[in-house]
Amino acid sequence: MASEGMILTNHDHQIRVGVLTVSDSCFRNLAEDRSGINLKDLVQDPSLLGGTISAYKIVPDEIEEIKETLIDWCDEKELNLILTTGGTGFAPRDVTPEATKEVIEREAPGMALAMLMGSLNVTPLGMLSRPVCGIRGKTLIINLPGSKKGSQECFQFILPALPHAIDLLRDAIVKVKEVHDELEDLPSPPPPLSPPPTTSPHKQTEDKGVQCEEEEEEKKDSGVASTEDSSSSHITAAAIAAKIPDSIISRGVQVLPRDTASLSTTPSESPRAQATSRLSTASCPTPKVQSRCSSKENILRASHSAVDITKVARRHRMSPFPLTSMDKAFITVLEMTPVLGTEIINYRDGMGRVLAQDVYAKDNLPPFPASVKDGYAVRAADGPGDRFIIGESQAGEQPTQTVMPGQVMRVTTGAPIPCGADAVVQVEDTELIRESDDGTEELEVRILVQARPGQDIRPIGHDIKRGECVLAKGTHTGPSEVGLLATVGVTEVEVNKFPVVAVMSTGNELLNPEDDVLPGKIRDSNRSTLLATIQAHGYPTINLGIVGDNPDDLLNALNERISRADVIITSGGVSMGGKYYLKQVLDIDLHAQIHFGRVFMKPGLPTTFATLDIDGVRKIIFALPGQSVSAVVTCNLFVVPALRKMQGILDPRPTIIKARLSCDVKLDPRPEYHRCILTWHHQEPHPWAQSTGNQMSSRLMSMRSANGLLMLPPKTEQYVELHKGEVVDVMVIGRL
C-alpha cells in the first residue's frame, strides 16, 4: 500500500480488486456463481478496468461473515476495490447493505445513485435494489446486484469514475493532478435560458426511439452510442452507458439496450467523461457502426414502413456498403453473436446440447466389487486344485454366503464378488470334476491356474468415483454423454438454449413449392433449403413464408416473429434491384445495426449481417442473397457457426480438411467457395475433391450430393488456376 503522499509508479498503479459473492445457494454449491465469475472477467479486461483479482470468495447471507471478509480485505489485504454481488434486494436474508454500512467509514452516495439511475432506465424493478457504496481506509466498497446481468450493468454504470476514485484514495498525486488539470480547462456550461419542458412518462416512452435515432444521426462519426452537446459538459448516465464495449458482447454476455437518450434529458460525451474513463472505442474490435436503440413496444407498434419507394430515379447506382473481406466478416459475425441463456431439460433430450454446469457422480461405479468375466470367485491363496462349489452369484443379486478355504462360487459377468473371495478365474481355466445326478448343478471344479489377488475384479469406484466430475461444463453432448448422464443418475441437466431460427423468402416472383408455375413466377426453393440446413443441425425453426418486395410487408413480417426468434434469416432483396428494400427496412424502420452489406467472396457478394437489440435481448439477422446456391453457401459459412456459438459450443468454427483436386479449377478474382464431393481412395491420406460442375450461383444442381466447399484463393497474375492433384482446403458441409 502506498504511504501518505507517495507518487505512484506505473507498477504501483495496478488496481487490486476483490470480488465477494454473497449467496446462500452458491455457498452450498446448489448454484453456480455466474455473477462473481463474470465480474472477475470484467475487472481483468484491459479494455475496461484492467485490474488484478487479488481475492475472491463466496459467503452465505450472514452479516457477520460478510463483515469479517470485508474488514480482512480492507485492513489486511489492503485491496483498492471490493465488489460485492448479491444480497441487495428486499428478501429477508438480503443483508449485504447492512453489513457494508457497519464496515465503511465514509459513504459514496454518488456511485449508488449512478447505479440506481442506470438501473431504472433498464427496468422499473431497479428501484428494488438497495446498494451501498463507501470507503474504509483506502479501500472502495461497492454493492452490486446478485444477477449476472444486473451486476454487469451496474459495474459499467460506475466504471468511468472508478480509476480516478481509486487514484484519489491512494493519493496518487500525479494522476489526480492530470485529471483535475483537464477538468479545469473545460468551459463552464451556460445557464439554461428556460427550464426544460416536463413530459409525462407516457410521452417519454413514445419519443424514446425517435430521439435516439435523431441523436445518432447527429453523431455519425462516433464509434459509440452517445451524443455531444456543446452546451453541456457534465458526466451523465447516458455517457456512461454509451461506453459499454462490444468486446463484452463477443464473450456471449447478454447485450444491454443502448438507449442512451433515455438515460438523461441532456446526454453528453464530454471531455470530462473521456478523461475519467479508461474505456476506449479504439479498442473495440467491431466495425465502426452506428448503435441503434429499440424497444419491443416501439417496433411492434410500427405497421407502415418509413422507407420512401417513390423516388426510383434517385436510387443508388453503386452499393453504399463497402466490400468486407471474408475473414473480417466471419470474425464480426462471431463477435456480435451472443451466447444464449440456459434451461433445464430431461437427460433424454440432451443430444447435441452444450452443458452449462459440471455433472458430478452421486455414487461409485461399480458400487460393489464386480466380476469382469464368467467364471469362479476364488481365494487367490488357495492356488490351483480341486474346489467345492458353494453356490452362484448372478448380476443383480447380492450373495449371502462367504467363500472359505477350499471353496469357490460360480459368478457371471457383472455379478458381485462374495465375501472371502479376492479373485476370479475364468471358466476357460477350469475343469468340471463333479456334478449333480440330474446335471443341473456343478458340485466340484478343478482350478488350473494360479490366480492373483484382484484378478478380473472391478473394485468399488473403478469406473467412476463418487463426487467425480464425469462431464464438464461446455461439453457438447452425444450418445455417450447421454449414456453417462443415465449412468450417474442425473436425469435433469442445465444446458445452453438452442437458438430459434425464423426463415423467410422475399420476392414478388416467388410461388410456394406446391403451386403451378405461372408466367414470370418461379417456385421458392431457398426457404426449403435453408430450413432443412438449419434443422439438420438440430435447431428449432419457424417458417415465415414468402414476403413480397414491399417495405410494409417486409416490416410487418419481421415484426410478427422477431420476438419469438433469436435469429432471422431472409433470402433475396439485398443486391441492387430497384425493388430491394430489405436493408432499408432494417436500417430505417427497425433501427438495426448493419455490420456489413457486401462480402468479397463468390458466391454471396451481397450477404448482409445485422443485429438488433430489443429490451436488452440481441436478435441476429442474416439477409442472404436470393440466388439459391448463394443462399445455402452463405448459410453454411456464416449462419451455422453463429448458431453453434449461440448454443454455447466452445469452438463454433466449421471443420476444414485437406483434399486433392480431381480436375483443374480456374480461379476467380474473388475468393471462391466451390461445391465439391469428397471421396476417399484406398490407402491415400487425403480425400479427392470432385467438382459438382457448373458453379453458377442460380444452379442448385451444383449443391446436389455436395459435402464440401473448395476454399479457393483469388486469382493473381502468377496463379490463374489450380491443377489436378494439388492439395487445397475444403470446408466440410455434409456427411463424409
From Swiss-Prot:
**What pathway is this protein a component of?**
Cofactor biosynthesis; molybdopterin biosynthesis
As for subcellular location, the record says: Postsynaptic cell membrane; Cell membrane; Cytoplasm, Cytosol; Cytoplasm, Cytoskeleton
Annotated Gene Ontology MF terms?
Answer: ATP binding; identical protein binding; metal ion binding; molybdopterin adenylyltransferase activity; molybdopterin molybdotransferase activity
Tell me the InterPro entries matching this sequence. Answer: MoaB/Mog-like_dom_sf (IPR036425), MoaB/Mog_dom (IPR001453), MoCF_biosynth_CS (IPR008284), MoeA-like (IPR038987), MoeA_C_domain_IV (IPR005111), MoeA_C_domain_IV_sf (IPR036688), MoeA_linker/N (IPR005110), MoeA_linker/N_sf (IPR036135)
CDD domains, sorted:
MoeA, MogA_MoaB
Q: Where is this region: MPT Mo-transferase?
A: 14-153
Where does the chain cross the membrane? none
Q: What SMART domains would the database entry show?
A: MoCF_biosynth (SM00852)
Compositional bias (Pro residues): 187-199
Polar residues bias located where? 261-290
Positions of the UniProt region annotated as Disordered:
181-232, 260-290
Span list, region MPT adenylyltransferase: 294-736
* BP terms from Gene Ontology: establishment of synaptic specificity at neuromuscular junction; gamma-aminobutyric acid receptor clustering; glycine receptor clustering; Mo-molybdopterin cofactor biosynthetic process
Which chain positions lie within coiled-coil regions? none
Record flagged with keyword Zinc? no
- Xref: PANTHER family: GEPHYRIN (PTHR10192:SF5), MOLYBDOPTERIN BIOSYNTHESIS PROTEIN (PTHR10192)
Which NCBIfam families does the entry link to?
Glp_gephyrin, molyb_syn
Biological function: Microtubule-associated protein involved in membrane protein-cytoskeleton interactions. It is thought to anchor the inhibitory glycine receptor (GLYR) to subsynaptic microtubules. Acts as a major instructive molecule at inhibitory synapses, where it also clusters GABA type A receptors. Also has a catalytic activity and catalyzes two steps in the biosynthesis of the molybdenum cofactor. In the first step, molybdopterin is adenylated. Subsequently, molybdate is inserted into adenylated molybdopterin and AMP is released.
Family stated for the protein in its record:
In the N-terminal section; belongs to the MoaB/Mog family. In the C-terminal section; belongs to the MoeA family.
Subunit-structure text = Homotrimer, homodimer and homooligomer. Interacts with glycine receptors.
Protein known as: Gephyrin
According to its UniProt entry, this protein's organism is Gallus gallus (Chicken)
Taxonomic classification: Eukaryota, Metazoa, Chordata, Craniata, Vertebrata
Question: What is the gene called?
Answer: GPHN
